[in-house]
Amino acid sequence: MQDRQKAQDYRALLLADTPLIDVRAPIEFEQGAMPGAINLPLMIDDERAAVGTCYKRQGADAALALGHRLVCGDIRQQRLEAWKAAYQRFPNGYLCCARGGQRSHIVQRWLQETGIDCPLIEGGYKALRQTAIQATWQLAQKPILLIGGCTGSGKTQLVRQQPNGVDLEGLARHRGSSFGRTLNPQLSQASFENKLAVELLKINARQTLKRWVLEDEGRTIGANHLPECLRERMAQAPIAVVEDPFALRLERLREEYFIRMHHDFTHAYGDEAGWQAYSEYLHHGLFAIRRRLGLQRFAELTDTLDRALAEQLSSGSTDGHMAWLVPLLNEYYDPMYRYQLEKKAANIVFRGTWQEVANWLKAQ
């Protein structure tokens, strides 16, 4: 057996993007997994549920026997071939189950019978998860600087350019607003937190870190919420506010939401289905804030959106979208953000255009 038979240096494993062959049931994997893990379960959900019920009623020996009866013959062989293929693809990988218990040991033993010595994570996913939680808490204690500004100010781009910048929206796969979803579905809360922890660990390991640079976010980014330890620190953090001309903000939003999203949808689904998905995406974003707009205003902007989509479909022009985007910014997004920023006015340490804020950051 290899020297790396069991692993307890969890931070090193996370920092190295160590491939994990996660043998938990799909439902467990969906609830939370580590970045880079692939789910090749020993038991699928129904099998796991049956074994769990048996364990409660008849004890461990009966549950283990049932598990072996459920995963035998062709089913066992198919799963074994999948684990072998995964190990051949990731020879530096580790087996991982919930706590480093029966499931990963069984898979390890079956692989040994074929001549493959695959190490396992001692303590399993639970140990890695605790390491991620502790790392986030520890690293969140470092100083933080927030980048603020109204929608379309280029905050995310500015954060990404900083060597100590953490793109929270990229990690969450969501841009924060009602139009913020991307083509990639959001991760579960635990998986998002795990991914954030690994990102913090990596950035911290690359350099002598004086502070984090983050975008000024609310408690939630789409369906994901920020860890409370980080959110508490952000609430007290200094803020550099980007104040770009309205016309420049509109051009950024045009590029991001009308040109790039249209391209991404059609690239993913084809012209016809992609257009339908793009149209539904814009309608859904507007629908999500209908009560805050008022139903009459929502209906008016929806009609304008429909006309803009018809124009874009027929001519390729995105100009028509300005007729509903401009009032949406003026009547909803800008007042909302300015109200939120006003409550944190004492934290503002710099204001300027995007380039001025970028230059200020370099000088710090």
Curated annotation (Swiss-Prot):
Entry-linked Gene3D superfamilies: Rhodanese-like domain (3.40.250.10)
Domain Rhodanese positions: 14-137
Enzyme kind, highest EC tier: transferase
EC number: 2.9.1.3
Alphabetized Pfam families for the sequence: Rhodanese (PF00581)
Keyword Plastid in annotation: no
InterPro entries: Rhodanese-like_dom, Rhodanese-like_dom_sf, SelU
GO molecular function: transferase activity, transferring alkyl or aryl (other than methyl) groups; tRNA 2-selenouridine synthase activity
Catalytic site positions: C97 (s-selanylcysteine intermediate)
Keywords of the record: Selenium, Transferase
Enzymatic reactions: 5-methylaminomethyl-2-thiouridine(34) in tRNA + selenophosphate + (2E)-geranyl diphosphate + H2O + H(+) = 5-methylaminomethyl-2-selenouridine(34) in tRNA + (2E)-thiogeraniol + phosphate + diphosphate; 5-methylaminomethyl-2-thiouridine(34) in tRNA + (2E)-geranyl diphosphate = 5-methylaminomethyl-S-(2E)-geranyl-thiouridine(34) in tRNA + diphosphate; 5-methylaminomethyl-S-(2E)-geranyl-thiouridine(34) in tRNA + selenophosphate + H(+) = 5-methylaminomethyl-2-(Se-phospho)selenouridine(34) in tRNA + (2E)-thiogeraniol; 5-methylaminomethyl-2-(Se-phospho)selenouridine(34) in tRNA + H2O = 5-methylaminomethyl-2-selenouridine(34) in tRNA + phosphate
Residues in coiled coil: none
Function: Involved in the post-transcriptional modification of the uridine at the wobble position (U34) of tRNA(Lys), tRNA(Glu) and tRNA(Gln). Catalyzes the conversion of 2-thiouridine (S2U-RNA) to 2-selenouridine (Se2U-RNA). Acts in a two-step process involving geranylation of 2-thiouridine (S2U) to S-geranyl-2-thiouridine (geS2U) and subsequent selenation of the latter derivative to 2-selenouridine (Se2U) in the tRNA chain.
NCBIfam families hit by this protein: PRK11784.1-1, PRK11784.1-3, tRNA_sel_U_synt
Family, per entry: Belongs to the SelU family.
The name this protein goes by in its record: tRNA 2-selenouridine synthase
Organism of this sequence: Salmonella gallinarum (strain 287/91 / NCTC 13346)
Higher taxonomy: Bacteria, Pseudomonadati, Pseudomonadota, Gammaproteobacteria, Enterobacterales
